[in-house]
Structures are given as structure tokens and as C-alpha cells.
Amino acid sequence: MSKKKPIVQYYDPFDLWPSIATDIESKIPLRNLQWVESYQYKKHTITSLDLEFLPWLEEFSSQDTSKDPTLLNIPLVNMLFLPEQDGEIYKTQHKPLATKWFQKVSKNENQSWMIVLVAEAQQAKRSNSLRRTHSRSSSYFAVKSTIDRVRGDFNTGNINHCVRLDYVRFGTPDAEGWNEFLKCLEWAVLSSLDSRFLQLSEQIRSIKLFDSSIFSDYLLFFLQKERLAASFFDLVLYRESLEQCEDMFSTLSKIISAIDGKKENISKYLGEGSDAQPDLKDFNSSFLILGSRYNTLHNLLADGDFTLFHFTLFLLSKIILLNLKISDYEKAFSTLQQALLFLTSSFFNEFVQNNLEIIAAFNYDCYTLLFKKITEAIHNNDTPIPLCCAKILLYARRQLTRMARWNNLIDDSSPLLWREPSFPLIEHHDNSLLDNRFQKLSETISSTSSFLSEYYRLSSEALSIFKAYKNRYSFVNTACDTGLAQYLLEDYENAYASLKNVDVQTAWSNDPLEEKWSKFYVDLLEKLEKFDEALEFASAISKGKVSIYNKNKILELSKKTAKSKVWNLDDFFTIEIPHMMAVVPHDDGINLSFMCESKVFDLESVDSVTCNYVLSSSKNPMNLLFTLHNSITDGKLNVHCNDIIPGRYHLKTIVFKLKDSVLSFQKDCLHSNKQIEVLNPTKHSNHLYILQSKISQQFQNDGIFACIPIMFGERFYKASCSEIKLSYIENSGFTNLEKSFLSEESHCGLESKTDSLVIKNIQKVPGVAKLYIPLTNTPVEGNEFLINLSYILESGQTVRFGKVLHIENAGIVEANCEKTNNMRDPLTSTIFLHIQPKEPIIFCSWNCMRKTKQGTYDNVFDIPYNIPVLSPMDCFTSCHFDSDMSIDLKFSMNCLRLADVVFMKLCVNIWERFDFIDIEHIMPLLDHACQQISLSNITQGTVVLPEEIRKLNGKKILNSFFDNEELRNEFSEFIQHLESEVSFNSLRSFVQEFEKKERLKNLPFYFSLHQTIGPLPFKDEMQSTTIEYIWKIPQKVLLNKPTEITLTFLRSLTHSKKEKQGQSFEIFYNFPAYTTTILFAGPTQRKIVWEKNQTTAQEQVTAVFLTAGRVMLPEVVVHSKDDDISILKNTKYTLVGRPLNDQPDLDYAP
């Protein structure tokens, strides 16, 4: 599309142009013209409009322009130059000439005109009729009179067509003169443009196109549209020109759609011969990208090439060129793709199939030429390269790859074709035509190395663009292609460097070609002798998948490296481990069976398996080490351990090792729920153990102790030495180990050391040894700790194991004691016990101890109760005390959780019925079920057993307890017929019976679930401080009148025989600032500090009473952090009177 300058035609009868041409042309081009089109009121901004000044030619102005390719072929403006003379010369000589010229130019449609009056320094000879001498001033005014006459003679309407250029006053026209000239010229240009565009737009609008329209209608429409587009182009309005071309292509697309792929319909819409097939000479990239073949549609018609093929490419070439002009490179690229896709339409199917290689070469040339034009444009404009350039390079690379395949430079299995879509193959092709028309491309595909070099160049340039735009997906794919090209060029180091820039494992993880890419990458690493990295990569891509690289390849790589490799077991093996198993050791140890499978390796290749079970502890863990008992068969893994230590273990690690390989696979299971519980040894074993995990707190010897029952197996004394060492972790709440002791029935001694306790001098197997270890001075709530036991067997083996113990929560109940005096007998006092249970308990006894002068404690009283307590209750007793004896009293209470009593009763009942089974198996399940007991389970003196107890009847549980079906059925029937409710009386009887020693000796297990709550908070009324407040109000109080009120606080020490010296404390008070009857102003809330010996405190407030009559003052809320301070309420009323209406304001009403 060639650009033409708009024309201004000038008429110069007095030869003025040579002297002023330079000045006028220096003002051109016109800048920033604002044109509002009259047709659609569209606003256009012409940034720069160059004009061509041509001398007057009458035929040129009046010629027929209907066939011109642009609206600018004829002059836009006709201009007349006249010299400036006096009025007489103008009237007799210049005006007739100007009038004759004006009559000619005014007949030309769509052309503007203007008259330029030029005042020269050497003026023409004046007329002889002017006989007087003119001064400069009179000449100036005469000249002014001349331009006014010209305007009066020729101007029409309010438009000024006449301007003056003054070369007399300053040798050149001033700025005002030039502005007037340019303004007139701009108006004339825009007026002509608007008129012409309006006329052409109306002509196009009058063309009605229908499905039944004939060829001539469509052709006229396209010709007029092209004139409009070309005219916009000449005015540097590229976007407007592009809009017209796109409108033309939209209409052509509708025609193509109506043709419906039938050649016989092409002639109907585009005329005879328009269905002709293209010729090979038409495939020139400059025709499509640069539009160099046909400038206008008239040229296309004149050459007889108006076919569907030529016309479509003609329009698309215009659109590509205009998009390049406006720097819309992405749109230019998409238009090129649209044009190349059009070549593959069904209209040209036969031609395409016969010329696949030529079309591919043409496509390659078009992509490379477009890339070249874009890079040249951005280089001139100093702008960043657009992202579409990378896509252009990749499309060019695709065409290049196809031609390389057709020339047998690569075969169908080449990795360069992995990502490429399928394309037809050419059995016989002639390179002579390709050599003649695409010589440079022919050289590129003359050899494999030249092709790969060009492939690498295109890929690397695209890669740099993707990298600049941080387009991760395209960058990764192109980096892989670049590395692949370098690999095929045997440049392995650079290929490795290209692939290291991306995470190839992640990039290929979801790629359908993952296996091919992975093999290529491993081969590259092997060529570089990076065997360790190749092995790691091969293992990473094989995780959990049906062997991309089978075991043979991985094993082969593992033999090339000397480093041992430990991989995650879950990535290659699947092991089904039960969440919880209760296991019973046999004579030779413990056997465990798991299901195992692998998608990568054969299980026969596993050489060894090691399972490490750890006793739950953060320090000094105790281990059970299981090893492979035999080979893995039928997907079943059998492991064995002969180191039998009772306790609950969680799985820590599993390690698999392959045969003849440095590879091993490990699974870490810290904090795992994959657990086993070794419940034995029981009473028949040669071990000792701690059965209970819940440890009670008891108040003994003026302190709180944890009672730990240690169970001894029947053969323990024969199988071990006479010492047992106990140690525990720090921060367990234990203190003063030297105060630890054993119960009297333990029949052994105890020695305390710095960090451990030693049970020694075991005279006989005691069954149970109750160990009391002192805790801190306050009850410990919910504290867990690990206690470790160790002893040496007769065989010399040292057995070490631990037990996680949970100190039973002492917060199951809140209790305190309070003492009041008997006024009649000062030495007799009443002691109250206030109990606030947090869950159902059995209150066993209430104890009081007194410290003697020797530092020991004697019992004052020990009152048994053995009653259930479900809600707050108070107990009291009367005691005889000396004067100050109360300060040395220690109170405590013993209780049992109701849930624990039910648990003990159920355990005993089961043991009595099934004394031949190990009750330890079922105890954890019973305990868990009984913990569900709450207040909702208690009705009318009975405890409703939780439904969880019935679940012990499950098949899995029964199978784990009993070996034969008869015992399973008997136990199932026993559970089924358990009473659903247990009375409080039966529970009380059970507790009393259970505490008898004879009964305890026959049990194979031991309970120590009594909770001792103490020392209890104790409050002595004799030493309590009392705070009383008093409202002091004036005698007369009036309605709605401010009244000063005093709030007085009084302090007294009730029945105190001696007050602690120097004691001070704080109280806090507050009362509402507003009630329905009183409004207060003043400190309604405040803190008061009582100093030593201070007895009163006062606060002043102002009150306004809102109601007359008897009014009650608000209650003052007083509280203190000191529990020994009592608050006495003092309710106060006052009478509020009404003031008389005729009385003046007084402080008090009469």
C-alpha cells in the first residue's frame, strides 16, 4: 500500500511563488489536525500531514476521480497568490483576474480554495491616478484597505478564505500572519477531506449486499471500501485504514461461508475465473508480508488475478502491513497464521497435496520475514521484543522440522518430533524447485548438522524471549527442546547446562511423553558420567509408578556408583500396617505379618527388612528390633523379634535393602499410629512391669505423693538379680527423691540416689510393691512422664524398658475447709468441708492432721463416708482446739472417680468368671469405655453403663482374646448379659470389699486409683477482716437538685486476738452511675488502698434524685483479691421531697 501526499494546487500569475515557496514549505507538514468526521462524527487526530504544492492545471482539478484508488489524487485546496497593491490597481487589474479564477475553482466539488495577498518589499508601480505623495503610514492603511476589499469581494458566510503575508514591515511575515495562514490552510484541507469522505461513505452505505447479490455488487463494495482504506492510509490514519480492511475481510469471510466449500459457488459471488487454483509463483513471502505484488485492487483486476486465493491474500497482506504500522505485532502474527491456514482449506486441497514442501518452505519464509520486520521496527523504536516473536520462531521451527523429515535428515522416532503434531509424508519429492525459489532454506536442510544448528538457533532465541517475559511453561518446554538439539549435536555439556535451568522432573511429571524425556535425560547424564545424579533422577521419576525405568535399569545405575543410597520406602513399596495390634509373645519371641507390594521392584529382590518399634518417649527410647523372618512370598512380609519387653510401641522406622545393591529404602514413622502393644509378661513371666498407666496422687506425711504399683512376675525372683533401678525424665513433678518410700507389704528395700531409685533386698516375690514418690507441694494436673526400669537377668542380659505414666488429674473436685467459733464454748469450733465435684465421685473420707512439736503429724479426726457425690455438698464436725492450734492443721479428703470404680468392678467380675485368661488384654478397652461415664449416665441412685462396653462383643476383639470358638461364645454371652445399671450401694460395697488385703492378694493385677485431695484451703473466721460501707445523706433531699453524698467504708478485724503488723491491702468498689431513680456524678468505681492501722475511707459523690418519695440507694459492689476479707452489705433508703413552685431555689426544702 503506497502512500501519496495530499496536493495543494496554486495559481501564481504574478510569479510570487519562487520568493515565498521556501517560507511556506518550512511550515509543512501540518501538525495535530483535529478532524471530526461528519458522517459518523468520529474524531480523528492527524499527527502529521505532509502536503505537495503543485502549479495550477485546470484539467487536473476537473478530471474524473471515480476510479482513483484514493481520495487524495486530486488537489484538496486551490490557492491564488496576488501581490498587494493600492486599491485602484486591485480594482482594475487584480480583482477581474481573481474573479475569473474563483468562478472556475468554485465549480469543483470537494475542493477548497483560498487567496493569499503577498506584501513584498519591492512593490509594483502604482497607478498614475494617485498623484499625491503617500507617507508610510498612509500606504499601510491603504494596504489594510486592500485585504479588507479582497475579503469583502470573495469571503462567503463567516469563513475567511483570504489571508495576508506581510514582507514589508519586518522583511518576513510575523507569527500572527503565519498563524492566520496556517489556520486557513488547515480549515481548507479538513473541509475538503470531510466532504470527500462523507460522499464516499454515503456511496458505500447505499450498496446493499444480500445472499443473492451478484458479483458486480460485491466488487463495487470492495473497490469503494479500498478507496476509503487507502485514503486513511495516505493521511497516516493507520487504525482507521485497518478498520476498513478488516471490514472488507469480514464481508469476504461471509462469502466464503456461503460458498460452503463448493467450487461452483465461487464464481457466483466473485465472478468467472475466481475459482482458479494458485500458481507456484504466488508463494512469495514478500507478497504476503510486505504487500509488494499488488498495491491496489485495481491492479489485481488489471492483471486478471482476481481469484478467491489472490483476493484473500491481498486483503490479509494489507491487514498484516497495517498491524505492523501500528505496532500490534501479536495481531500481525495471528493474521499471518490465518492466511497460512487459508491455504489448507478445501478449495486448494489438490494443490496443497501436490506441493507440501513448497508450502512448508513458504510458511517458513513468511514467519522468518515477519520476525525480521518486527525486530527491525522495535530496534528503531527502542522497545522490548514482543512475546509473539518467540511463538513466530517456534512456528518457523515446526516448518523446518517437517522439511527435515521429508529430506530424511531425521526419522519418525526422532525426539525432535515428540511434541510436533502429525503431518503427511512425501514419498517422492523434487528439490530442484525448492533450490531455485528458497535457496537459503535449501542450504539449511542440506545436511543434518546445518538443520540442527538452525533448529538450535530458533529454539535458543525463543528461549531468551520466554525468559524475559517469565513465561514459565513455555520457557521449560523450549529449554528442553534447546537441550535436545544440543544433545543431538553431541554438545553434551551445554545440553546439560540448558536442562539444569529447569526442574525437568516437575516439568515432565504430567507430560504424556514423560518416559521418553526421562530416558533421554538419563542417557545424557550417563554420557557425562554423572551416575549419582542419573540414579537419583531415575528413582525420582519411578516413585509409585509402574516402572518407567524398571528395576534392572535402576540396579544397573546403582552398580556404577559407590555411594550408598537411602530412598523413601513409600515411593517404591506399599505396606499395610494395622493401626493397633495387641500381640502375645510366644516362647521364641514375637512374629508380625504385614502385606507388601511394589510397582517398581520384584519382592524377591529384597534382601533384608528391619522394623524398629520404639516405646513412646522423647528421651532414652526402648526399642524392639524386628528382622525379616523369611523371604517375602505372596506379598506377605513376616518379621520376628525375640527381645520381649512389655509395653506399647509405635513404629519408628522400616528399612528395606535390595540384593547386590547399594540401594536401601527407609520409612520414618515418628508419631505414628502404627502401634503394637506387648501385653505380656504377666504374672507367669520372669519380668516385672507397671500395669497401670494412671497414677493416683495421695497426701502422705505432710506431702503429696505419686503411688506407683510395680508388678512382679512369678519367676522374676529366680530369673533376675536382686536390684531394680528406676529413673525418670526431668520436669515430671517429682521432688526430694530421698523422701520416697515403699509400702509395708512390699517386702523389699529402697535406696535413693541423685537421679534414680534402687529397689533392693527383694526377699521374696511380693506380687505388688507400692512405691511412693514425692511430688511438688501442689497437686499436679494431667502431668505425663516416662519412668524407666532396668534389671539384669540371670543370663546376664540387661532388660530396659519404660512406661508412660499419667498422674491422675487432681482437679476432679474442688474442696475447702472453714472454721467458725462456738460463742458459748470458746475452745470448741465447727469445721465445715465444702465439696464442689467436677465429675461424679465417691467421697471416701475426710481427714485432719495436726503438727506436733516434734515435727510429725497426728490424726485429729478421720471420718469415713463412702458416699457418691454428684453435686455440691457440705460436711461439718465439731472439734476441741487450743487457742492457736488451728494454724497447724492440715485437712485432706480421699475420693474415687465413679468411672474408675465401675472399671475396677468390671475387671474383677471378668477375672472371677474367666480366671484362665490374661485380663491385661481387655483392661485398656474397659478403661476407655468406662471413661465415658458422666452425670448424664446417673439416674435415681444408679449408674447406666456406657454403650461402648457392649462393643467388646465385637468379632475382632473376641478373636484377639480367645483361641477357640467355645470361649468366644461364652465371653460374648457374659458381655451380653451384663447388667445395664449398677447401683450406688453395690459400688460402695465393692469399694469396702476391695480394700481388704485378703481380697487384694488373690488378684493378678493391682489398682491404686484413690485420689487424696489436700492440703485443702482453710479459712479461720477469727482472723478475717470485715469491710462495711455506709451512705451518709443530708436530712433534706429535693427532687432534681444536686445533692452531695458521702460513701464511707469501715474496716474491722473480727474476733482478732492479734493482728499482723504492717499489713496493707486493696479493695475495689463500683456502683451504677445511672439508675431509674438516681443520677450520680463522681467516682462510681475506684481502687482504695488501706494503709497500716487505717480504719476508714471516704468518697464524695454528687447525686440528682429523679423520683420523689422513698428511694433506695444502689448496692455498692466491693471485692478484694484477699480471700480473708469479708464484705457486709448496708442497704440504705432516703426520702426525696418536691420543692414548692413559688419558693426560690434553696439548698434544702422545708
From Swiss-Prot:
Domain of life, per lineage: Eukaryota
Signal peptide stretch: none
Recorded GO CC terms: cis-Golgi network; cytosol; TRAPPII protein complex
GO BP annotations listed: early endosome to Golgi transport; intra-Golgi vesicle-mediated transport; intracellular protein transport
Family of this protein: Belongs to the TMEM1 family.
PANTHER family: EPILEPSY HOLOPROSENCEPHALY CANDIDATE 1/TMEM1, TRAFFICKING PROTEIN PARTICLE COMPLEX SUBUNIT 10
Protein's name in the database: Uncharacterized protein CC285.14
Species: Schizosaccharomyces pombe (strain 972 / ATCC 24843) (Fission yeast)
